[in-house]
Curated annotation (Swiss-Prot):
It comes from Corynebacterium glutamicum (strain R). The keyword Hydrolase applies. GO terms for molecular function: dGTPase activity. Residues 8-18 have a biased composition (Basic and acidic residues). The keyword Glycoprotein does not apply. This is Deoxyguanosinetriphosphate triphosphohydrolase-like protein.
């Protein structure tokens, strides 16, 4: 395994050694990263992902994937890649668990709506919210002075969770569209990034990122097939495939030719051809599962092989080494990701559903602003009262909305509408 250092295991707030059993002096012998993973696994923020949208909503269909089940799948894939590369499996696993932990209700649609209402405090970004939850908002470690350190994860754990390891605003004043830290949290990110000589994410974060792409593309295509939104026969319809490739290249980058090549290589796989005949029978469900299993194994195995071949004789870990994704795997994953996203987006009810979701977020934001601090939960109420500016107060309100499950947000939106109607 890669030789992680004491600096990698260091925490921002010192902690006493923990006893592992009652009435004994035995010390907890878990590694720092195993403890980190346990903290994420037991966090309320992770549990709330069970009631947050993945591609379809948590209440669509009998067995939909939610942000929580997606995160568990990402963690399992990341653990496998990490083990294959001799990285710490717990470190890669926890990165997968918390990669979406900052996402608000309604996925990227909710993220865009919150970014609008958060303009006065610098905007909203799901990746930056992840860091904020892990280092501030999730209640676990509090200093004697009352400062929250969130889960107080190790440096390497926080680094592995940072997909875009830079703050919103650069030194020259330019602004990044994607980032892992709000400007007010840049000091924390600087502490995390000690030892890095460039802006590359650590290889554990690269593992998490590609594991997310694998889970998103393979498993969400599975959901789309079962829901009737996706028909794999499009891979054999060259006219429709060309149109899909154009849309995918525009949405995710690359060229249409790359996506068409991905479709061509997928067509050659017997498991894909078998899954394309899905008809809701027992055999077709089994064929669909066979396809998802083979595709995940295909992308994990080929990436491990390519990375080890490129870095032969070198210990990869932390800031040393890059994940090498074969071109065939990359093009297939991008094509499947296009299927997962665009077929759902093209659903006739999708735009109307998104508008309703945005309206709920705007209504709840107005309700909390007008009623603050009394309208806020006790923990957020305290932070609101302690805020030094209106901008900081807005950030607290945005933090609370982002932490809500979709069910709670919808209840609060209904209550806010009832109160508004009563007041006229």
């Amino acid at each position: 395994m890669y030789p992680y250092s004491d600096a990698d295991a260091f925490r921002r707030h010192p902690e006493r050694a923990k006893s592992s059993q009652l009435r004994t002096s035995a010390v907890d012998t878990r590694s720092a990263f195993a403890r980190d993973r346990a903290r994420v696994l037991h966090s309320a923020a992770l549990r709330r992902l069970a009631d947050k949208t993945q591609v379809v909503g948590p209440n669509d269909g009998d067995t939909p994937r939610t942000r929580l089940t997606h995160s568990l799948e990402v963690a399992q894939i990341a653990r496998g890649i990490g083990a294959g590369l001799d990285l710490d499996p717990d470190l890669c696993d926890l990165a997968g668990l918390c990669h979406d932990i900052g996402h608000p209700p309604y996925g990227h649609n909710g993220e865009n709506a919150l970014n609008e209402v958060a303009a006065a405090c610098g905007g909203f970004e799901g990746n930056a919210q992840t860091l904020r939850i892990l280092t501030r908002l999730e209640p676990k470690i509090v200093s004697d002075e009352g400062a929250s350190f969130g889960l107080n994860l190790s440096r390497a754990a926080l680094d592995a969770a940072c997909k875009y390891p830079w703050a919103k605003t650069n030194a020259d004043g330019s602004v990044n569209k994607k980032y892992s830290a709000y400007d007010e949290d840049a000091e924390i990110l600087d502490w995390i990034r000690q030892g890095h000589e460039d802006l590359r994410p650590p290889i554990e974060a690269q593992v998490m990122d590609f594991s997310d792409d694998i889970a998103y593309s393979v498993h969400d295509v599975e959901d789309g097939i079962v829901s009737g939104r996706i028909d794999l026969k499009v891979l054999w319809d060259l006219v429709e495939l060309a149109a899909l490739a154009d849309k995918g290249a525009a949405a995710f980058g690359g060229s249409p030719a790359e996506l068409i090549e991905g479709a061509a290589s997928l067509r050659e796989l017997p498991v894909v051809a078998a899954a394309a005949d899905f008809d809701f029978s027992l055999r077709s469900y089994a064929a669909l599962k066979a396809m998802t299993s083979e595709l995940v194994g295909r992308y994990v195995g080929s990436t491990i092989e390519s990375t080890k071949k490129t870095h032969a004789g070198i210990d990869v870990g932390r800031m040393y080494g890059d994940l090498i994704i074969p071109e065939t795997a990359a093009s297939e994953v991008k094509l499947l990701k296009t299927l997962a996203v665009l077929y759902v987006m093209d659903d006739p009810g999708h735009l109307a559903r998104q508008n309703r979701q945005r309206d709920r977020i705007f209504r709840v934001f107005d309700y909390l602003v007008l009623g603050a601090p009394g309208s806020l939960d006790p923990m957020y109420r305290q932070w609101f009262i302690e805020a030094n500016s209106e901008s900081e107060q807005i950030r607290v309100i945005v933090d609370q909305i982002a932490s809500m499950t979709e069910s709670r947000l919808e209840r609060l939106a209904r209550n806010a509408a009832d109160i508004s109607g009563f007041l006229g």
